[in-house]
């Protein structure tokens, strides 16, 4: 497997805001399900990100992440990233690896890692961590990390929160389990690269290249609006509870019955 040698690393002394984009599944032609994104449109996104990194004068530095470990991450995303010379971070639901149809096995995951892509954990079963305690929480955090480290032979220090759900108890458990970066679903640009919590912008089907370009403008009003919307939805989750909220989420997002991304992926 060809290893990516990116020539678009952040310039020394340049510390812009970072905007992390979150993708899930890619598919040729896309889908009505909002978490499935068109492969060709993803290529256009990556091309834009490379152009912005090459310019090295913009205030926002784009980063690419994927959640869940869908097979399209290997079959569709990796060739695009390699062709453009860009690396991404893939957060893996460990219990699905090699076990759930439509998701990567350890062979594909090793190939991702060996090509130079970064790997992080996304729990063991994709359970909301706020619903877990004791041994269950330990398996979702420490169990997932240790399995990835054993299978890939590398240190795993980043965690993506399933469904973006967390509280102070979960954050403390993540740190205790050895994670030094915790990725959320809060749509915001990050200024401090040393911070523990990292926000991300969830990419949905139908998001145009122009809308992405606008989000990367310094001081983007569109990004600020998305963060306000996120706060409103977070309040709705608290009011309705996860069960009711996720049923509404699945209906509004046209969730496919057999898709790996479930309501727990709602930001």
Which positions does each model-derived feature cover?
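A short acidic, often aromatic-flanked loop/helix-cap motif at beta-alpha or helix-coil junctions
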Residues: 128-129, 190-191, 204-208
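C-terminal domain-boundary segment and adjacent tail
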Residues: 30, 34-59, 149, 175-193, ...
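Short, acidic/turn-prone active-site loops that include or flank metal/cofactor-
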Residues: 93-97, 186-190, 203-204
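Metal-dependent polysaccharide deacetylase catalytic core of the NodB/CE4 family, i.e.
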Residues: 18-28, 32-33, 60-62, 70, ...
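Short glycine- and acidic-rich boundary segments immediately preceding or forming the N-terminal edge
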Residues: 1-50
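Extracellular/periplasmic catalytic domains that process cell-envelope and extracellular macromolecules
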Residues: 12-15, 83, 190-192
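Membrane-proximal basic amphipathic "stem/tether" segments
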Residues: 1-19, 199-267
């Amino acid at each position: 497997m060809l290893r990516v040698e990116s020539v678009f690393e952040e310039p020394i002394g340049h510390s812009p805001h970072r905007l992390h984009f979150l993708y899930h599944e890619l598919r040729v032609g896309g889908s009505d399900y909002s978490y499935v994104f068109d492969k060709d449109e993803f290529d256009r996104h990556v091309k834009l990100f490379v152009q912005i990194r090459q310019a090295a004068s913009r205030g926002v530095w784009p980063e690419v992440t994927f959640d869940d470990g869908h097979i399209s991450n290997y079959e569709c995303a990796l060739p695009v990233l390699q062709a453009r010379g860009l690396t991404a971070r893939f957060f893996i639901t460990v219990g699905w690896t090699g076990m759930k149809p439509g998701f990567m096995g350890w062979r594909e995951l090793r190939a991702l890692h060996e090509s130079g892509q970064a790997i992080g954990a996304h729990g063991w079963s994709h359970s909301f961590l706020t619903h877990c305690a004791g041994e269950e929480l330990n398996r979702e955090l420490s169990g997932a990390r240790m399995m990835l480290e054993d299978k890939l032979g590398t240190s795993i220090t980043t965690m993506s929160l399933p469904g973006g759900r967390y509280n102070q108890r979960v954050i403390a458990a993540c740190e205790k389990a050895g994670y030094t970066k915790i990725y959320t679903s809060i749509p915001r640009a990050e200024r401090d690269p040393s911070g523990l919590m990292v926000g991300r912008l969830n990419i949905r089907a139908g998001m145009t290249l122009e809308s992405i370009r606008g989000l990367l403008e310094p001081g983007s009003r569109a990004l600020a609006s998305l963060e306000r919307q996120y706060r409103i939805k977070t309040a709705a989750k608290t009011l309705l509870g996860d069960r009711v909220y996720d049923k509404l989420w699945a209906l509004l997002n046209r969730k496919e019955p057999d898709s790996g991304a479930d309501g727990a992926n709602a930001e």
